[in-house]
Amino acid sequence: MNASFLPPQAGPLLTRHLKMGGANPAGIRLDLTNRYLTRAGQPFLPVMGEFHFSRCEAEAWPAELAKMKAGGVTIAATYLFWIHHEEIEGARRFTGNLDIRRFVLDCGRAGLAVVLRIGPWAHGECRNGGFPDWLVRKGIPLRCNDPAYLALVRGWYAAVFAQVQGLLYKDGGPVIGVQLENELVDDAAHLATLKQIAVEAGFDVPYYTVTGWNAAAGARIPADEVLPVFSAYPDAPWAAGTAPLPLSPHYVFDAERNDAAVGADLMARTAPDGWQLPYDRYPFATCELGCGQQSTYHRRVRISPMDAYALSLVKLGSGNNLIGYYMYHGGTNPVGRLSTMQESRATGYPNDYPILNYDFDTALSEYGEARPQYGLLNLLHLFAADFG
Protein backbone atom coordinates (compact mmCIF):
# COMPACT_ATOMS: atom_id res chain seq x y z
CA MET A 1 0.00 0.00 0.00
CA ASN A 2 1.27 3.48 -0.89
CA ALA A 3 0.46 6.41 1.36
CA SER A 4 1.13 10.08 0.89
CA PHE A 5 0.86 13.15 3.08
CA LEU A 6 -0.78 16.21 1.61
CA PRO A 7 0.34 19.22 3.67
CA PRO A 8 -2.29 21.80 4.52
CA GLN A 9 -2.46 24.82 2.27
CA ALA A 10 -0.93 27.71 4.16
CA GLY A 11 -2.99 30.86 4.39
CA PRO A 12 -1.51 34.34 4.44
CA LEU A 13 1.19 35.12 6.99
CA LEU A 14 -0.26 37.16 9.86
CA THR A 15 1.98 39.31 12.06
CA ARG A 16 1.37 41.42 15.17
CA HIS A 17 -2.30 40.34 15.21
CA LEU A 18 -1.99 38.59 18.57
CA LYS A 19 -1.95 40.61 21.78
CA MET A 20 1.41 39.27 22.89
CA GLY A 21 5.11 39.96 22.52
CA GLY A 22 7.74 41.92 24.39
CA ALA A 23 11.38 42.96 24.49
CA ASN A 24 14.19 42.55 27.01
CA PRO A 25 16.43 45.46 28.09
CA ALA A 26 18.76 44.71 25.15
CA GLY A 27 15.87 45.33 22.77
CA ILE A 28 15.58 41.72 21.63
CA ARG A 29 11.90 41.19 21.00
CA LEU A 30 9.97 37.93 21.30
CA ASP A 31 6.86 37.75 19.13
CA LEU A 32 4.79 35.27 17.16
CA THR A 33 3.01 35.06 13.86
CA ASN A 34 0.26 32.65 12.87
CA ARG A 35 2.99 30.19 11.81
CA TYR A 36 5.92 30.43 14.21
CA LEU A 37 7.55 32.20 17.15
CA THR A 38 10.06 34.95 16.43
CA ARG A 39 13.11 36.32 18.21
CA ALA A 40 14.54 39.63 17.01
CA GLY A 41 12.25 39.35 14.01
CA GLN A 42 13.53 35.91 12.96
CA PRO A 43 11.68 32.59 13.27
CA PHE A 44 13.00 30.24 15.95
CA LEU A 45 11.98 26.77 17.09
CA PRO A 46 12.35 26.31 20.86
CA VAL A 47 12.26 23.04 22.80
CA MET A 48 10.34 23.14 26.09
CA GLY A 49 10.69 20.49 28.80
CA GLU A 50 8.46 20.17 31.86
CA PHE A 51 10.22 19.83 35.23
CA HIS A 52 8.32 20.37 38.48
CA PHE A 53 10.60 22.08 40.97
CA SER A 54 8.36 21.18 43.92
CA ARG A 55 8.70 17.49 43.03
CA CYS A 56 12.50 17.59 43.28
CA GLU A 57 15.06 18.47 45.94
CA ALA A 58 16.24 22.06 45.54
CA GLU A 59 19.88 21.04 45.87
CA ALA A 60 19.50 18.92 42.73
CA TRP A 61 17.97 21.64 40.54
CA PRO A 62 21.22 22.99 39.01
CA ALA A 63 22.49 19.56 37.95
CA GLU A 64 19.12 18.45 36.59
CA LEU A 65 18.60 21.68 34.67
CA ALA A 66 22.08 21.27 33.17
CA LYS A 67 21.04 17.82 31.95
CA MET A 68 17.95 19.32 30.34
CA LYS A 69 20.06 21.97 28.61
CA ALA A 70 22.50 19.31 27.41
CA GLY A 71 19.54 17.36 26.01
CA GLY A 72 18.60 20.24 23.74
CA VAL A 73 15.89 21.82 25.90
CA THR A 74 15.80 25.62 25.69
CA ILE A 75 12.76 26.39 27.89
CA ALA A 76 11.95 24.88 31.30
CA ALA A 77 8.22 24.73 32.02
CA THR A 78 6.93 24.14 35.53
CA TYR A 79 3.64 24.03 37.38
CA LEU A 80 3.05 25.96 40.57
CA PHE A 81 0.67 23.73 42.49
CA TRP A 82 -1.34 25.93 44.83
CA ILE A 83 -1.76 23.11 47.36
CA HIS A 84 2.02 22.65 47.59
CA HIS A 85 2.47 26.29 48.57
CA GLU A 86 -0.65 27.00 50.64
CA GLU A 87 -1.87 23.72 52.09
CA ILE A 88 -3.14 25.69 55.09
CA GLU A 89 -5.06 28.85 54.18
CA GLY A 90 -2.95 31.96 54.68
CA ALA A 91 0.24 30.00 55.40
CA ARG A 92 2.01 30.31 52.07
CA ARG A 93 5.44 28.73 51.68
CA PHE A 94 8.06 29.54 49.06
CA THR A 95 11.15 28.14 50.76
CA GLY A 96 13.22 24.99 50.38
CA ASN A 97 11.87 22.78 47.60
CA LEU A 98 9.08 25.34 47.08
CA ASP A 99 11.42 28.25 46.35
CA ILE A 100 10.30 29.24 42.86
CA ARG A 101 12.61 32.26 42.80
CA ARG A 102 15.64 30.08 43.41
CA PHE A 103 14.45 27.69 40.69
CA VAL A 104 14.00 30.46 38.12
CA LEU A 105 17.45 31.82 38.94
CA ASP A 106 18.89 28.32 38.53
CA CYS A 107 17.16 28.10 35.14
CA GLY A 108 18.74 31.36 34.08
CA ARG A 109 22.18 30.20 35.15
CA ALA A 110 21.65 27.01 33.11
CA GLY A 111 20.80 29.07 30.04
CA LEU A 112 17.12 28.11 30.04
CA ALA A 113 14.14 30.37 29.53
CA VAL A 114 11.11 29.69 31.76
CA VAL A 115 7.37 29.28 31.27
CA LEU A 116 5.43 29.33 34.55
CA ARG A 117 2.18 27.35 34.60
CA ILE A 118 0.52 29.35 37.36
CA GLY A 119 -2.87 27.68 37.53
CA PRO A 120 -4.88 28.30 39.62
CA TRP A 121 -6.06 24.80 38.64
CA ALA A 122 -3.28 22.69 37.21
CA HIS A 123 -4.14 18.97 37.17
CA GLY A 124 -0.65 17.42 36.85
CA GLU A 125 -1.95 14.30 38.65
CA CYS A 126 -1.90 16.40 41.83
CA ARG A 127 -4.44 16.24 44.65
CA ASN A 128 -7.55 18.28 43.69
CA GLY A 129 -5.73 19.25 40.50
CA GLY A 130 -3.56 21.49 42.67
CA PHE A 131 -6.37 23.20 44.57
CA PRO A 132 -5.85 23.25 48.35
CA ASP A 133 -8.40 21.28 50.36
CA TRP A 134 -9.49 24.44 52.15
CA LEU A 135 -10.43 26.03 48.82
CA VAL A 136 -12.46 23.00 47.77
CA ARG A 137 -14.26 22.97 51.13
CA LYS A 138 -15.40 26.58 50.78
CA GLY A 139 -18.19 25.40 48.53
CA ILE A 140 -17.86 28.32 46.12
CA PRO A 141 -17.94 27.83 42.32
CA LEU A 142 -14.41 27.13 41.08
CA ARG A 143 -12.71 27.65 37.72
CA CYS A 144 -15.14 30.37 36.69
CA ASN A 145 -15.75 34.11 37.13
CA ASP A 146 -17.37 33.77 40.53
CA PRO A 147 -16.33 36.90 42.51
CA ALA A 148 -15.37 35.00 45.67
CA TYR A 149 -13.20 32.61 43.67
CA LEU A 150 -11.57 35.41 41.68
CA ALA A 151 -10.66 37.23 44.88
CA LEU A 152 -8.71 34.18 46.02
CA VAL A 153 -7.09 33.78 42.60
CA ARG A 154 -5.90 37.39 42.79
CA GLY A 155 -4.19 36.61 46.07
CA TRP A 156 -2.55 33.50 44.62
CA TYR A 157 -1.31 35.21 41.46
CA ALA A 158 -0.01 38.17 43.48
CA ALA A 159 1.86 35.83 45.82
CA VAL A 160 3.49 33.99 42.92
CA PHE A 161 4.47 37.21 41.16
CA ALA A 162 6.07 38.55 44.34
CA GLN A 163 8.46 35.60 44.21
CA VAL A 164 9.56 36.16 40.60
CA GLN A 165 9.44 39.95 40.47
CA GLY A 166 12.44 41.26 38.55
CA LEU A 167 13.00 37.93 36.77
CA LEU A 168 10.69 38.49 33.79
CA TYR A 169 12.04 38.76 30.25
CA LYS A 170 11.40 42.51 30.21
CA ASP A 171 13.73 42.77 33.24
CA GLY A 172 16.45 40.73 31.57
CA GLY A 173 15.30 37.58 33.36
CA PRO A 174 14.40 34.13 32.01
CA VAL A 175 10.58 34.15 32.42
CA ILE A 176 9.20 34.48 28.88
CA GLY A 177 5.67 33.19 29.42
CA VAL A 178 2.90 32.02 31.69
CA GLN A 179 0.23 29.40 31.19
CA LEU A 180 -3.21 30.24 32.53
CA GLU A 181 -5.31 27.41 33.99
CA ASN A 182 -5.18 23.97 32.32
CA GLU A 183 -7.63 21.92 30.28
CA LEU A 184 -10.38 24.52 30.61
CA VAL A 185 -12.21 23.90 27.38
CA ASP A 186 -15.45 25.87 27.48
CA ASP A 187 -15.00 29.25 29.18
CA ALA A 188 -13.15 31.84 27.11
CA ALA A 189 -14.44 34.63 29.35
CA HIS A 190 -12.80 33.08 32.41
CA LEU A 191 -9.49 32.63 30.60
CA ALA A 192 -9.63 36.29 29.58
CA THR A 193 -10.26 37.26 33.20
CA LEU A 194 -7.33 35.15 34.38
CA LYS A 195 -5.05 36.89 31.89
CA GLN A 196 -6.26 40.27 33.13
CA ILE A 197 -5.63 39.27 36.75
CA ALA A 198 -2.17 37.95 35.87
CA VAL A 199 -1.25 41.17 34.08
CA GLU A 200 -2.57 43.26 36.97
CA ALA A 201 -0.45 41.16 39.35
CA GLY A 202 2.64 42.06 37.29
CA PHE A 203 3.02 39.20 34.81
CA ASP A 204 4.00 41.29 31.79
CA VAL A 205 5.53 38.59 29.57
CA PRO A 206 5.83 37.96 25.83
CA TYR A 207 3.72 34.80 25.77
CA TYR A 208 0.45 33.82 27.46
CA THR A 209 -0.60 30.25 26.77
CA VAL A 210 -3.61 28.04 27.43
CA THR A 211 -4.17 24.39 26.62
CA GLY A 212 -6.05 24.17 23.35
CA TRP A 213 -7.27 20.60 23.28
CA ASN A 214 -10.87 19.54 23.54
CA ALA A 215 -12.70 16.36 22.61
CA ALA A 216 -14.76 18.25 20.03
CA ALA A 217 -13.14 21.12 18.14
CA GLY A 218 -10.53 22.81 20.28
CA ALA A 219 -10.90 24.76 23.50
CA ARG A 220 -12.86 28.00 23.59
CA ILE A 221 -10.24 30.67 24.11
CA PRO A 222 -10.32 34.48 24.14
CA ALA A 223 -9.59 35.44 20.55
CA ASP A 224 -6.03 36.66 19.90
CA GLU A 225 -5.29 37.06 23.63
CA VAL A 226 -3.50 33.76 24.25
CA LEU A 227 -1.58 31.06 22.40
CA PRO A 228 -3.32 27.65 22.39
CA VAL A 229 -0.81 24.84 22.96
CA PHE A 230 -1.49 21.19 22.27
CA SER A 231 -0.62 17.66 23.34
CA ALA A 232 -0.10 14.09 22.18
CA TYR A 233 0.71 10.99 24.22
CA PRO A 234 1.79 7.47 23.28
CA ASP A 235 -0.84 5.89 25.55
CA ALA A 236 -3.79 6.84 27.75
CA PRO A 237 -3.37 5.56 31.32
CA TRP A 238 -6.44 7.60 32.28
CA ALA A 239 -8.61 5.40 30.02
CA ALA A 240 -11.24 3.58 32.05
CA GLY A 241 -10.31 0.02 31.06
CA THR A 242 -7.24 -2.12 30.53
CA ALA A 243 -7.97 -3.31 26.99
CA PRO A 244 -5.62 -2.39 24.13
CA LEU A 245 -6.27 1.06 22.71
CA PRO A 246 -7.08 1.82 19.07
CA LEU A 247 -4.14 2.70 16.86
CA SER A 248 -2.92 6.20 17.67
CA PRO A 249 -3.33 8.95 15.07
CA HIS A 250 -0.26 10.68 16.49
CA TYR A 251 2.15 8.49 14.53
CA VAL A 252 0.82 9.63 11.16
CA PHE A 253 1.83 12.91 9.53
CA ASP A 254 -1.23 15.14 9.31
CA ALA A 255 -2.41 18.65 10.07
CA GLU A 256 -4.43 17.72 13.17
CA ARG A 257 -3.38 19.65 16.28
CA ASN A 258 -6.14 18.68 18.68
CA ASP A 259 -5.92 15.51 20.76
CA ALA A 260 -9.38 14.32 21.67
CA ALA A 261 -8.01 11.75 24.13
CA VAL A 262 -6.02 13.93 26.56
CA GLY A 263 -8.19 14.95 29.46
CA ALA A 264 -11.11 12.92 28.11
CA ASP A 265 -11.63 11.53 31.61
CA LEU A 266 -12.59 15.05 32.76
CA MET A 267 -13.93 16.86 29.68
CA ALA A 268 -17.13 16.88 27.66
CA ARG A 269 -17.02 15.24 24.25
CA THR A 270 -19.15 17.53 22.10
CA ALA A 271 -19.47 21.15 21.01
CA PRO A 272 -23.18 21.33 20.15
CA ASP A 273 -23.10 24.91 18.91
CA GLY A 274 -20.53 24.18 16.21
CA TRP A 275 -17.59 25.95 17.87
CA GLN A 276 -14.28 25.58 16.02
CA LEU A 277 -10.99 26.97 17.31
CA PRO A 278 -9.53 29.19 14.53
CA TYR A 279 -6.25 27.32 14.13
CA ASP A 280 -5.07 29.44 11.21
CA ARG A 281 -4.58 32.44 13.51
CA TYR A 282 -2.02 30.68 15.71
CA PRO A 283 1.23 28.78 15.20
CA PHE A 284 1.14 25.05 15.92
CA ALA A 285 2.71 24.75 19.37
CA THR A 286 2.78 21.93 21.91
CA CYS A 287 3.27 21.81 25.66
CA GLU A 288 2.54 18.13 26.33
CA LEU A 289 4.24 15.69 24.01
CA GLY A 290 4.60 12.54 26.08
CA CYS A 291 8.21 11.37 26.07
CA GLY A 292 6.97 9.16 28.89
CA GLN A 293 3.69 8.38 30.61
CA GLN A 294 2.61 8.22 34.24
CA SER A 295 0.97 4.93 35.18
CA THR A 296 -2.34 4.75 36.99
CA TYR A 297 -3.08 1.88 39.35
CA HIS A 298 -5.39 0.23 36.84
CA ARG A 299 -3.37 0.90 33.67
CA ARG A 300 0.39 0.55 34.07
CA VAL A 301 1.99 1.45 30.77
CA ARG A 302 5.59 1.28 29.58
CA ILE A 303 6.77 3.68 26.92
CA SER A 304 9.61 2.65 24.62
CA PRO A 305 12.26 5.17 23.56
CA MET A 306 11.01 5.00 19.96
CA ASP A 307 7.46 5.72 21.14
CA ALA A 308 8.75 9.06 22.41
CA TYR A 309 11.07 9.84 19.49
CA ALA A 310 8.60 8.95 16.74
CA LEU A 311 5.85 10.99 18.40
CA SER A 312 7.97 14.13 18.50
CA LEU A 313 9.34 13.53 15.01
CA VAL A 314 5.87 13.17 13.48
CA LYS A 315 4.58 16.30 15.21
CA LEU A 316 7.61 18.26 14.02
CA GLY A 317 7.00 17.03 10.49
CA SER A 318 3.35 17.99 10.82
CA GLY A 319 4.19 21.62 11.53
CA ASN A 320 4.86 21.80 15.28
CA ASN A 321 6.88 24.96 15.87
CA LEU A 322 7.22 24.72 19.66
CA ILE A 323 8.37 21.28 20.79
CA GLY A 324 7.00 20.97 24.32
CA TYR A 325 7.33 17.83 26.47
CA TYR A 326 5.37 16.66 29.50
CA MET A 327 7.13 15.39 31.48
CA TYR A 328 10.74 15.77 30.37
CA HIS A 329 12.03 15.17 33.92
CA GLY A 330 10.20 13.01 36.44
CA GLY A 331 9.83 13.75 40.13
CA THR A 332 8.54 12.71 43.54
CA ASN A 333 5.30 13.94 45.06
CA PRO A 334 5.88 15.76 48.34
CA VAL A 335 3.96 14.67 51.42
CA GLY A 336 1.94 17.50 52.87
CA ARG A 337 1.35 18.44 56.47
CA LEU A 338 -2.30 17.39 56.17
CA SER A 339 -2.41 14.80 53.38
CA THR A 340 -0.57 13.12 50.58
CA MET A 341 -0.47 15.04 47.31
CA GLN A 342 -1.38 12.59 44.55
CA GLU A 343 -4.56 12.51 42.48
CA SER A 344 -6.92 9.81 43.71
CA ARG A 345 -10.47 8.56 43.48
CA ALA A 346 -10.85 9.32 47.18
CA THR A 347 -10.81 13.04 46.32
CA GLY A 348 -13.37 12.70 43.54
CA TYR A 349 -11.00 12.29 40.61
CA PRO A 350 -11.29 9.41 38.14
CA ASN A 351 -7.89 7.77 38.68
CA ASP A 352 -5.58 6.53 41.41
CA TYR A 353 -1.92 7.45 40.99
CA PRO A 354 1.11 6.44 43.07
CA ILE A 355 1.43 8.31 46.35
CA LEU A 356 5.05 9.33 45.85
CA ASN A 357 6.34 8.28 42.45
CA TYR A 358 5.94 10.74 39.59
CA ASP A 359 8.74 9.28 37.50
CA PHE A 360 6.66 9.39 34.31
CA ASP A 361 8.97 6.82 32.69
CA THR A 362 10.41 9.79 30.84
CA ALA A 363 13.66 11.11 29.37
CA LEU A 364 15.14 12.03 32.77
CA SER A 365 13.85 9.87 35.57
CA GLU A 366 12.58 10.75 39.03
CA TYR A 367 16.21 10.63 40.21
CA GLY A 368 17.85 12.18 37.14
CA GLU A 369 18.77 9.00 35.26
CA ALA A 370 19.00 9.56 31.50
CA ARG A 371 16.85 7.04 29.66
CA PRO A 372 17.40 6.06 26.00
CA GLN A 373 14.81 8.55 24.71
CA TYR A 374 16.96 11.34 26.16
CA GLY A 375 19.64 10.71 23.54
CA LEU A 376 17.20 10.00 20.72
CA LEU A 377 15.28 13.20 21.32
CA ASN A 378 18.50 15.19 21.55
CA LEU A 379 19.26 14.24 17.94
CA LEU A 380 15.92 15.74 16.95
CA HIS A 381 16.60 18.84 19.04
CA LEU A 382 19.99 19.34 17.41
CA PHE A 383 18.30 19.15 14.02
CA ALA A 384 15.65 21.66 15.10
CA ALA A 385 18.31 24.02 16.44
CA ASP A 386 20.23 23.99 13.15
CA PHE A 387 17.37 23.90 10.67
CA GLY A 388 14.40 25.25 12.64
Question: What name fits each language-model region?
Answer:
Residues 1-75:
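N-terminal carbohydrate-binding accessory modules
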Residues 45-58, 81-99, 135-155, 174-188, ...:
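The substrate-binding groove and active-site-proximal loops of carbohydrate-active enzymes
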Residues 3-12, 138, 149-167, 171-179, ...:
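Carbohydrate-binding surfaces of carbohydrate-active enzymes
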Residues 219-297, 353, 364:
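Glycoside hydrolase catalytic-domain groove-lining segments
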Residues 183-203, 211-254, 331-339:
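Substrate-binding cleft/loops of secretory-pathway carbohydrate-active enzymes
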Residues 47-49, 76-78, 114-118, 176-180, ...:
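Hydrophobic faces of well-ordered beta-strands that scaffold small-molecule active sites
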Residues 61-128, 133, 195-200:
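Aromatic-lined substrate-binding rim segments of carbohydrate-active enzymes
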